[in-house]
């Protein structure tokens, strides 16, 4: 802080302003008040006056403090890099020796030069020795006593000053400086020591002078004077620490080198106590005056930033703390013998200044390793700094500022959705930049918020990068990169045969005879409601059969069966002919390009007519071989077994023509035929292996579910270890129930399987939400019509295929007046959560081949939820249809029940007109509606108000009797009018 007035100067010196004003006046400075300005020359005069008044006491110690702030980037536990502020403080204390003591030691060193010359020089990097203590002379100030041994401390890191080759240009008086151990406190302490024998000077003025000296940038000549003054004691301090020295071309007196060598060998420096005489005091006073003049000149110079001289290439082989310098030091010492007049030596100013600047460059990698500064980092500097402390800090900050990097325009592939953090990472910028740009665009986002592709591309373009609309990051592309199964050897495989046909035409019975097992008798209602997969070993080879349902509800299931098959056996009953599901099976087979084999079943029945079946199939473009077509017709009987062998022979012949092959030694691929949720085993899927070999323990992916095959059983319930092509198996271990018809693939990497499954779940969720949104919009328009009722249902089935069929059948029942709403449909037993959902939506729970848990039953009973169980799809559809019929608005029908003629009209006060009537036909009831006819034209329609016979109120009057009646709300009755009596009946409607 620069002080411009006496008051500011006094505040800086922490002394009263009037005392400072008196001192300035006594020093010859013409100032009248504390508000007058104080110049640098006035301060120099004050300092000179105080020194004259208190003797030649000078500042014995100068403290230099250096502070550097830098940043390092370090990764935290989450992997993100964080910026950490690092502040490094360095501090040096320089102590000045007494001139008389230096002169005495110089004389002794010159006297001992001849003795030390022939001695072998010690290595420069000798071990630290404490045998060379520096003892202050008697006339040294008492404050120097604790600092002298500090100069010989073994961990002193800064080099000492060398003997000057010629006197300094600015100051005639040398100012020897020896480096002392740094103070422990972080703040600079610039308080000069005072001799006890001399009068004490004001400490604040001395401290301010030293601070001014620190802040003022010294000239090179002044630096040279300070750094190259003769300092034998400092050299003896040097002997107590290792110091690598590199020789540099510089002339120097030869006498100082033996003295330094002697000091490094650890020889004690004899110190005498010279008598303090008047001549010594006069010499000290002259030295003080010279130094004061130099300080005044220094303070009056304009400030400028000086740069330390750059070291020559190869001149500095190591730093003060690097072992490289130890090897170079002995050679340098040998070259610096006294006899070598033209030898060169290292200039400490250049060396130390370079190490000071090198320290800044070494500091950056050191900071990245540890946030705390290392012990040797702050000592590696030298005395050749640039100007004052502030300028050095500014220079250091400039050096450590990250160099501005050139902007790199990147190509950024933007997917359909991307988070702010991921987008910033792709552009190699901070997320804050992306958020800032989005705020400029008027969008407030967080770092984890997901952006759509269009917005993200705008941000990328705004930040100067090239945006490329990338395809969705579909991990299913990994499936295309898997080893192709065709690389493995393709071997012949068994044909997969699907049995299709109309319901009750004998498909399962036919398979039952082939398998020699009673399956049909175990089916509920004698009809098949699941796909059954079996493989049969015949004398001609293995054949895999898929039995599909024939009921109309199972269209999707039959389509899946046709997709997975090689050959279709179309079963047609000889006594029934072609039916709707027969035609549908033909269409499925043709759409899949699958060859047909027609089995005309039930030929053992008396009413069987195979020829009629052929004619009907020809109409459906299924031409038998005897008619010139390519479809074999085989008459069979599932009851007697007639024609079964011919059927199998035709099937195997078709398979032989197809030349069915599949790789065996390859990862398995297959199709989910059926899936269900087993209470004890979890999700269970029936898989038809189409290629490769599925082994127990394989990681499989089926639609949006994945897992490891924990158990594998065949259709007979036996545990197996592997399944080859065309073999149906049941597997356990999937995470959830897959959808029937999903493709199954075995993967080597479970992580990749999980990734693909989660991706598919996300896609399915998006599609489902989009469908729900569309359905809500449609239902909104549908519900605009009045009287639309909704029947909410919750459907739980045993297998996924049955759920699909039942939901489709129930949804078809919807009409304009009553709509079926399937609130929830899933595979598995009826749980408590299903009942809670039914309570919330007021739904009916339908269980198809499943039962409710005990807790769910109690909850349903207590809340009045209707739970219905079915095992035949007909019954479920019929009962829901009946319930919907009950919800239909009844049909209203008008029925005429009588005819009355008005014979007389009586007018009675307070009542009005009363009609005396005769019932001509039918009867008249009191609550009936009346239509008044006048000249056979309807004149009024309303209700009877009262009906009397004589004086009694009656409920009805039959034909042939007279009565009196009044009309509600009408008195317009005339003789001869006819009253038509009618009732409105409600008739229940059906769907």
UniProtKB/Swiss-Prot annotation:
Coiled coil: none
Compartmental location: Cytoplasm
Summary of the function given for this chain in its UniProt record: One of the essential components for the initiation of protein synthesis. Protects formylmethionyl-tRNA from spontaneous hydrolysis and promotes its binding to the 30S ribosomal subunits. Also involved in the hydrolysis of GTP during the formation of the 70S ribosomal complex.
InterPro entries membership: DNA-bd_dom_put_sf (IPR009061), EF-G-like_DII (IPR053905), EFTu-like_2 (IPR004161), IF2_assoc_dom_bac (IPR013575), IF2_II (IPR044145), IF2_N (IPR006847), P-loop_NTPase (IPR027417), Small_GTP-bd (IPR005225)
Region (G4): 601-604
Record region (Disordered): 58-82, 106-405
Name of the gene: infB
GO molecular function: GTP binding; GTPase activity; guanosine tetraphosphate binding; translation initiation factor activity
Name of the protein: Translation initiation factor IF-2
Biased composition (Gly residues): 379-388
